Protein backbone atom coordinates (compact mmCIF):
# COMPACT_ATOMS: atom_id res chain seq x y z
CA UNK A 1 0.00 0.00 0.00
CA UNK A 2 2.93 2.34 0.56
CA UNK A 3 3.47 5.12 -1.96
CA UNK A 4 7.17 5.71 -2.49
CA UNK A 5 8.81 8.93 -3.59
CA UNK A 6 12.35 10.28 -3.46
CA UNK A 7 13.54 11.23 0.01
CA UNK A 8 14.39 14.80 0.77
CA UNK A 9 17.66 15.15 2.62
CA UNK A 10 17.48 18.48 4.37
CA UNK A 11 19.46 19.19 7.53
CA UNK A 12 18.88 21.45 10.52
CA UNK A 13 21.36 23.84 8.90
CA UNK A 14 18.59 24.46 6.36
CA UNK A 15 15.48 25.05 8.49
CA UNK A 16 13.30 26.21 5.60
CA UNK A 17 14.17 23.01 3.73
CA UNK A 18 13.28 21.03 6.86
CA UNK A 19 9.87 22.73 6.94
CA UNK A 20 9.36 21.77 3.29
CA UNK A 21 10.50 18.20 4.02
CA UNK A 22 7.83 17.95 6.72
CA UNK A 23 5.23 19.10 4.23
CA UNK A 24 6.42 16.43 1.79
CA UNK A 25 5.82 13.81 4.46
CA UNK A 26 2.39 15.26 5.25
CA UNK A 27 1.45 15.06 1.57
CA UNK A 28 2.71 11.47 1.31
CA UNK A 29 0.81 10.38 4.40
CA UNK A 30 -2.32 12.18 3.20
CA UNK A 31 -2.10 10.26 -0.10
CA UNK A 32 -1.84 7.03 1.88
CA UNK A 33 -4.84 8.03 3.99
CA UNK A 34 -6.84 8.89 0.86
CA UNK A 35 -6.51 5.34 -0.49
CA UNK A 36 -6.91 3.60 2.86
CA UNK A 37 -10.73 3.17 2.87
CA UNK A 38 -10.82 1.62 -0.62
CA UNK A 39 -7.79 -0.53 0.16
CA UNK A 40 -9.47 -1.82 3.32
CA UNK A 41 -12.65 -2.57 1.40
CA UNK A 42 -10.79 -4.57 -1.27
CA UNK A 43 -8.04 -6.25 0.76
CA UNK A 44 -9.09 -6.01 4.39
CA UNK A 45 -6.73 -5.47 7.26
CA UNK A 46 -3.21 -6.56 6.24
CA UNK A 47 0.33 -6.20 7.50
CA UNK A 48 0.82 -3.43 4.91
CA UNK A 49 -2.11 -1.52 6.43
CA UNK A 50 -0.71 -2.02 9.91
CA UNK A 51 2.74 -0.77 8.87
CA UNK A 52 1.41 2.29 7.05
CA UNK A 53 -1.07 3.25 9.75
CA UNK A 54 1.61 2.93 12.44
CA UNK A 55 3.86 5.27 10.44
CA UNK A 56 1.02 7.75 9.95
CA UNK A 57 0.15 7.67 13.65
CA UNK A 58 3.78 8.12 14.63
CA UNK A 59 4.25 11.09 12.30
CA UNK A 60 1.10 12.99 13.19
CA UNK A 61 1.36 12.22 16.92
CA UNK A 62 5.01 13.28 17.22
CA UNK A 63 6.53 15.07 14.25
CA UNK A 64 3.57 17.18 13.12
CA UNK A 65 3.13 18.92 16.51
CA UNK A 66 6.89 19.61 16.59
CA UNK A 67 6.66 21.04 13.07
CA UNK A 68 3.86 23.35 14.18
CA UNK A 69 6.01 24.42 17.15
CA UNK A 70 8.89 25.12 14.75
CA UNK A 71 6.62 27.46 12.85
CA UNK A 72 4.88 29.12 15.78
CA UNK A 73 7.90 29.49 18.06
CA UNK A 74 10.67 30.13 15.54
CA UNK A 75 9.70 30.72 11.92
CA UNK A 76 6.60 32.92 12.23
CA UNK A 77 8.04 35.30 14.86
CA UNK A 78 11.20 35.81 12.80
CA UNK A 79 9.32 36.24 9.54
CA UNK A 80 6.86 38.80 10.88
CA UNK A 81 9.78 40.93 12.14
CA UNK A 82 11.11 41.36 8.60
CA UNK A 83 7.79 41.06 6.75
CA UNK A 84 5.02 42.50 8.96
CA UNK A 85 2.52 42.14 6.10
CA UNK A 86 2.52 38.39 6.82
CA UNK A 87 0.81 38.79 10.21
CA UNK A 88 -2.71 38.16 8.87
CA UNK A 89 -1.62 34.95 7.15
CA UNK A 90 0.31 33.86 10.24
CA UNK A 91 -2.73 34.44 12.45
CA UNK A 92 -4.81 32.30 10.07
CA UNK A 93 -2.17 29.56 9.97
CA UNK A 94 -2.02 29.40 13.76
CA UNK A 95 -5.82 29.01 13.87
CA UNK A 96 -5.53 26.30 11.25
CA UNK A 97 -3.01 24.47 13.44
CA UNK A 98 -5.73 24.14 16.08
CA UNK A 99 -8.22 22.88 13.48
CA UNK A 100 -5.66 20.41 12.09
CA UNK A 101 -5.00 19.06 15.59
CA UNK A 102 -8.74 18.66 16.23
CA UNK A 103 -9.18 16.78 12.95
CA UNK A 104 -6.18 14.62 13.76
CA UNK A 105 -7.51 13.79 17.22
CA UNK A 106 -10.76 12.50 15.69
CA UNK A 107 -9.02 10.57 12.90
CA UNK A 108 -6.34 9.08 15.14
CA UNK A 109 -9.00 7.47 17.34
CA UNK A 110 -10.27 5.53 14.33
CA UNK A 111 -6.75 4.64 13.20
CA UNK A 112 -5.86 3.37 16.68
CA UNK A 113 -9.07 1.30 16.71
CA UNK A 114 -8.15 -0.07 13.28
CA UNK A 115 -4.70 -1.28 14.31
CA UNK A 116 -6.09 -2.75 17.53
CA UNK A 117 -8.66 -4.55 15.34
CA UNK A 118 -11.62 -2.86 17.04
CA UNK A 119 -12.87 -1.58 13.68
CA UNK A 120 -12.51 -2.60 10.05
CA UNK A 121 -13.01 0.68 8.22
CA UNK A 122 -12.27 4.39 8.48
CA UNK A 123 -14.73 7.24 7.96
CA UNK A 124 -13.98 8.59 4.46
CA UNK A 125 -15.43 12.01 5.34
CA UNK A 126 -13.11 12.30 8.31
CA UNK A 127 -10.14 11.52 6.09
CA UNK A 128 -11.33 14.00 3.46
CA UNK A 129 -11.74 16.75 6.06
CA UNK A 130 -8.27 16.02 7.42
CA UNK A 131 -6.64 16.09 3.96
CA UNK A 132 -8.53 19.20 2.85
CA UNK A 133 -7.41 20.99 6.01
CA UNK A 134 -3.79 20.23 5.23
CA UNK A 135 -4.20 21.14 1.55
CA UNK A 136 -5.54 24.60 2.49
CA UNK A 137 -2.89 25.01 5.16
CA UNK A 138 0.07 24.11 2.96
CA UNK A 139 -1.20 26.34 0.14
CA UNK A 140 -1.18 29.34 2.49
CA UNK A 141 2.01 28.44 4.31
CA UNK A 142 4.52 27.52 1.62
CA UNK A 143 4.59 31.00 0.06
CA UNK A 144 5.69 32.22 3.50
CA UNK A 145 8.52 29.66 3.44
CA UNK A 146 9.67 31.22 0.16
CA UNK A 147 9.47 34.67 1.71
CA UNK A 148 11.51 33.40 4.64
CA UNK A 149 14.15 32.07 2.27
CA UNK A 150 14.45 35.50 0.72
CA UNK A 151 14.12 37.70 3.82
CA UNK A 152 15.69 35.91 6.77
CA UNK A 153 19.42 36.26 7.34
CA UNK A 154 21.77 33.30 7.48
CA UNK A 155 22.32 33.95 11.20
CA UNK A 156 18.60 33.84 11.95
CA UNK A 157 18.18 30.68 9.89
CA UNK A 158 21.10 29.05 11.71
CA UNK A 159 19.57 29.90 15.07
CA UNK A 160 16.17 28.61 13.94
CA UNK A 161 17.76 25.34 12.86
CA UNK A 162 19.41 24.96 16.26
CA UNK A 163 16.08 25.51 18.03
CA UNK A 164 14.30 23.06 15.75
CA UNK A 165 16.96 20.41 16.33
CA UNK A 166 16.96 20.95 20.10
CA UNK A 167 13.18 20.55 20.17
CA UNK A 168 13.64 16.98 18.93
CA UNK A 169 16.41 15.93 21.28
CA UNK A 170 15.55 13.13 23.68
CA UNK A 171 15.16 14.46 27.18
CA UNK A 172 16.26 12.08 29.91
Swiss-Prot record:
It comes from Haemophilus influenzae (strain ATCC 51907 / DSM 11121 / KW20 / Rd). This is Uncharacterized protein HI_0243. InterPro entries: Hemerythrin-like. Gene3D superfamilies: nmb1532 protein domain like. Pfam families: Hemerythrin.
